[in-house]
Amino acid sequence: MNKCWCALAIVLTLAAIQANPTAQVTDEQAPPTFRARFETSQGPFVIEVHREWAPIAADRFYTLVRRGFYNDARFFRVLNGFMAQFGLNGDPKIQGEYATANLLDEPPKQSNLRGFVTFAKESSPNTRYTMIFINYKDNSYLDADGFAPFGQVVSGMEIVEKLYSGYGRQNVPDQRRIKSEGNAYLTAEYPKLDFIKTAQIENTK
């Protein structure tokens, strides 16, 4: 797969929003290291987060998991040999709370290797907010574009690689409709998508 196309794909799948890192959403400070366990329609996997890698991202992820934001969220974009993306809440009202709650950019301290977890963003500055992707392979070329990993799948990567990818690159759900219609849209038009049953903080170190 063309590397430039892959980087562009992550950018283009984000709906255009105005960067506003001062929006009224307060994130908790995450522990230095913690794990989040995801129970999915395919089985469980665990992400270990190291706050020192990307503190702003770690705090947002920690807050979202603790608030149950990812519960019942769909893996709406899964591309074999590239990545699995999720992070839009199934309730438009809840998703709307983060519409302008963007995060300031952080320089990558780790590389986008297989199993590493990163917030998606646009090409313009400070556009990370709730969407995340898990790298399926060495995508280290994304580092130069500012995609900063904050964690790594430490258990269940085989589950992540089983997520439904049959809709491919052409028949990708419309993110604007996910935001405005939620899971009702995805259930009706993309019924085979795998989803997160629950996501919970597993332990702290």
Regions found by a protein language model. Give the residues of each.
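Cyclophilin-like peptidyl-prolyl cis-trans isomerases
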Residues: 4-7, 13-205
